[in-house]
Amino acid sequence: MASSNFYKNLGPRKLTTIIDFLHDIIEHPKIYEDIVIHDIKILQEASRNDISFLSNTKYSEFLKTTNAAACIVPKNFKGEVNPNTILIHAENSYFAYGKLIDFFYAPIKSYPAKIMKSAIVAASAIIGKNCYIGHNVVIEDDVIIGDNSIIEAGSFIGRGVNLGRNARIEQHVSINYAIIGDDVVILTGAKIGQDGFGFSTEKGVHHQIFHTGIVKIGNNVKIGANTTIDRGSLQDTIIEDLCCIDNLVQIGHGVKIGKGSIIIAQVGIAGSSTIGKYCALGGQVGIAGHLNIGDQVQVAAQSGVAQNIEAGKIVGGSPAVHIMNWHRQSIIMKQLIKKRPK
């Protein structure tokens, strides 16, 4: 439930207005002309003034008892439902829910176009129009910040960094040696552009390799809290457009992540590996260095990838194998344990 301390409810709104706004609704009844919706809530908490949604069928049982006035459901949903709840069938119910949240709520916190007095901004830095530079932010020489960008308290933007338009940089982020596109969101505590983990060992002494590469981040990228992205040694570290990177992810030097890929929390990608376009790496996946992961590969959570993966494959386990082989291995292991003498 959204707290009024942090979010402003823009309702109430007529159900007809909601359906017109969503656009992608493909089927709905014609008996809702006078229905007014005050809020969005989960099925278990919704009242007769609320709308809800169903995207995961694990929760379909709550449709029988929900008090929601209406519920957005998947295109082909035909489950049992409270007869007083209007079902609105959408092509993608979760996407419709996301649009609906934007329609009903706005953050109370605002960012006026100003540079706070405690911020330190180099004379040679270029700050675009309508930007907010928060308390104790440091922006070094020759930085370029695009229009309509927000940089929150305590963040550090190192010399020569280029940050595109409409960026949102949350608190205590540090960015060095980076060129970043438009509409990028970087959450609290992320670190971008630091030295990679590159050492040569000579006579028992580890020597740091000087890194001359940078980090290049495309447009419409989200980077989660406390994620670290190292700059390359010779080749750049590259995050292409539309990638979503969760919290606590480590991306090594010289890694390339293809367009639209999703990286879940606590993934570690060792240096010089390439992740293809529209891949999905589950939580705590480990990718060894110098590997090539093809386009549209899916890797199950906690898998360890030690060899190249062809495009379109689904893998799991450690070492990662084809998902069906992993399931077979798990079944055989259970059978062996049962047969083992006590």
Swiss-Prot record:
Catalyzed reactions per annotation: a UDP-3-O-[(3R)-3-hydroxyacyl]-alpha-D-glucosamine + a (3R)-hydroxyacyl-[ACP] = a UDP-2-N,3-O-bis[(3R)-3-hydroxyacyl]-alpha-D-glucosamine + holo-[ACP] + H(+)
Regions crossing the membrane: none
Keyword Transit peptide: no
CDD domains: LbH_LpxD
Job of this protein: Catalyzes the N-acylation of UDP-3-O-acylglucosamine using 3-hydroxyacyl-ACP as the acyl donor. Is involved in the biosynthesis of lipid A, a phosphorylated glycolipid that anchors the lipopolysaccharide to the outer membrane of the cell.
EC number(s) recorded for this UniProt protein: 2.3.1.191
Organism encoding this protein: Rickettsia canadensis (strain McKiel)
Cellular component terms per the entry's GO annotation: membrane
Keyword terms: Acyltransferase, Lipid A biosynthesis, Lipid biosynthesis, Lipid metabolism, Repeat, Transferase
Gene3D superfamilies on file: Hexapeptide repeat proteins, MurE/MurF, N-terminal domain
Keyword Transferase assigned: yes
Molecular functions (GO terms): N-acyltransferase activity
Biological or metabolic pathway of the protein: Bacterial outer membrane biogenesis; LPS lipid A biosynthesis
Disulfide bonds: none
Subunit field text: Homotrimer.
Entry protein name: UDP-3-O-acylglucosamine N-acyltransferase
A GO biological process held by the record: lipid A biosynthetic process
Residues the record marks as active site: H253 (proton acceptor)
Family annotation (InterPro entries): Hexapep, Hexapep_transf_CS, LpxD, Trimer_LpxA-like_sf, UDP_GlcNAc_AcTrfase_non-rep
Pfam families the record matches: Hexapep, Hexapep_2, LpxD
Top-tier EC class: transferase
Residues forming coiled coils: none
Family membership noted in the UniProt record: Belongs to the transferase hexapeptide repeat family. LpxD subfamily.
Domain of life: Bacteria
